[in-house]
Amino acid sequence: MAVFDEVKDVVVEQLSVAPDAVKMESKIIEDLGADSLDVVELVMALEEKFEVEIPDSEAEKLISISDVVNYIDGLKK
């Protein structure tokens, strides 16, 4: 499964949004309606899913789905 698809699954589950609402260009807060607590929970779920640690300083930079996918892709290399 591609990183985008795995991220999308986590986002759909954590934010209770429709799968077709999650696109690479979707902004987590603006487009998907997440609040700050949602973002924290989303980051924790992503850390668990991908078995990585995302420092708070990096998590703050994850604005869109593409930011998340690119960040996780970078960690997996």
UniProtKB/Swiss-Prot annotation:
Pfam families attached to this UniProt entry: PP-binding
Superkingdom of origin: Bacteria
GO molecular function: acyl binding; acyl carrier activity
Modification after translation, per record: 4'-phosphopantetheine is transferred from CoA to a specific serine of apo-ACP by AcpS. This modification is essential for activity because fatty acids are bound in thioester linkage to the sulfhydryl of the prosthetic group.
GO biological process terms held by the UniProt record: lipid A biosynthetic process
Residues modified as O-(pantetheine 4'-phosphoryl)serine: S36
Subcellular location per the Swiss-Prot or TrEMBL entry: Cytoplasm
Keyword vocabulary terms for this entry: Cytoplasm, Fatty acid biosynthesis, Fatty acid metabolism, Lipid biosynthesis, Lipid metabolism, Phosphopantetheine, Phosphoprotein
Domain Carrier: 1-76
Entries under Gene3D superfamilies matching the protein: ACP-like
Annotated pathway: Lipid metabolism; fatty acid biosynthesis
A single GO cellular-component term on record: membrane
Family: Belongs to the acyl carrier protein (ACP) family.
Function comment: Carrier of the growing fatty acid chain in fatty acid biosynthesis.
NCBIfam families: acyl_carrier, PRK00982.1-2, PRK00982.1-4
Protein name (Swiss-Prot/TrEMBL): Acyl carrier protein
Organism: Campylobacter fetus subsp. fetus (strain 82-40)
Gene: acpP
